[in-house]
Amino acid sequence: MAEETQGADAVPQISFKKRTNKAKANFRKKPDTPPPASDSDSDFTSSDDEEGRRIKRRRKNAAVTASSTTAGPRRNVVEDQPATETAAIPLTSSNDATKHSNWYDEELSEKNLLGTTRARPASNTQSAPDGTYKGAANYSSFIQKNPNAPTKQFGPIKAPTNVRTVTVMDFAPDVCKDWKQTGFCGFGDSCKFLHAREDYKQGWELDREWEIGTKGKQLSGRVVSKRSGDAKTAEDDEDDDDEELLESIPFACIICKSSYKSPIVTKCGHYFCESCALQRYRKNPSCAACGAGTGGVFNVAKKLNHLLDKKRERARKLREQAIAEGEEVSSDEEGDEES
């Protein structure tokens, strides 16, 4: 009995609070469902049951009716809403102001273009052949390729950026001695020396000579050449042909390397001095220019004598004209006139 009384005392006592009339008056009720905007447009009818709930039923004979008021389009009016604050976008740093472009592709990197400086790997020892022929496709290649070599072998190659090269082109050519002395070279166009007779000087030498020659003098202009409107005559055409022929003929004998003395012409069309040709024929009957056999036939070069006479006459007139105008005459022009 004592245990039953202790268990009854352990159960808590619950009290229920009753709602007062004032509290019931303040209790909000759910409003009734409003009727639809137009019952005629719908195929359903509504009615209230005994408990006050609205019941919707489908009409059996539904008719479509339209009016001018309901035919207009319905517009959804959006009320103005206050602007809401958007989330701040985090700023990212970029190098747009200092960005630069490089025309080299990623594949054409410095390693691919220049390679590396590591030593070549040791060659792999292949197994000895067993003597069986396996066809041309199975031939072994003994060429050792460097894997560190640049892959690009053609086209523009990127130069190293840590090396700066300066190239200076100095025009100091090696002149062919035979061509300068005689106007003939046995190598022809394949000669590696320059075929020229002019004496070239550096720019500073020309400027220095000009300053020395014109220092303290008053420079006065004069007519160097005058363009004539007259047409060329037959004599001018003949002179041009003679000049072209003289350019194709060496201006000196290639044996004695001096001016022609009683010039003769061989069957192959080369010109020599008469004494030089006869003296060479005693030892070697071939031509000194091309090596062809002469057969002991040497004809007098009448046309060359005529051309040389005209050349000397023209040089003499030019020299006299230069002296009359007070110009200096070089030693080369005097030598040409005497020859």
Curated annotation (Swiss-Prot):
UniProt-listed SMART domains: RING (SM00184), ZnF_C3H1 (SM00356)
Listed GO biological process terms: mRNA processing; snoRNA splicing
Alphabetized Gene3D superfamilies for the sequence: Zinc finger, CCCH-type (4.10.1000.10), Zinc/RING finger domain, C3HC4 (zinc finger) (3.30.40.10)
Listed Basic residues bias regions: 16-28
Annotated Gene Ontology cellular component terms: U2-type spliceosomal complex
Alphabetically ordered keywords of this record: DNA-binding, Metal-binding, mRNA processing, mRNA splicing, Nucleus, Spliceosome, Zinc, Zinc-finger
Compartment list: Nucleus
Chain intervals for the UniProt region annotation (Disordered): 1-102, 114-133, 221-243, 319-339
Any one GO molecular function term: zinc ion binding
ZnF endpoints (RING-type): 253-291
Zinc finger (C3H1-type): 170-198
Principal subcellular localization: nucleus
Compositionally biased spans, kind Acidic residues: 40-50, 325-339
Function of the protein: Involved in pre-mRNA splicing.
Record family assignment: Belongs to the CWC24 family.
Quaternary structure and partners: Associated with the spliceosome.
Name this polypeptide is given: Pre-mRNA-splicing factor cwc24
Protein source organism: Aspergillus fumigatus (strain ATCC MYA-4609 / CBS 101355 / FGSC A1100 / Af293) (Neosartorya fumigata)
Lineage: Eukaryota, Fungi, Dikarya, Ascomycota, Pezizomycotina
Gene: cwc24
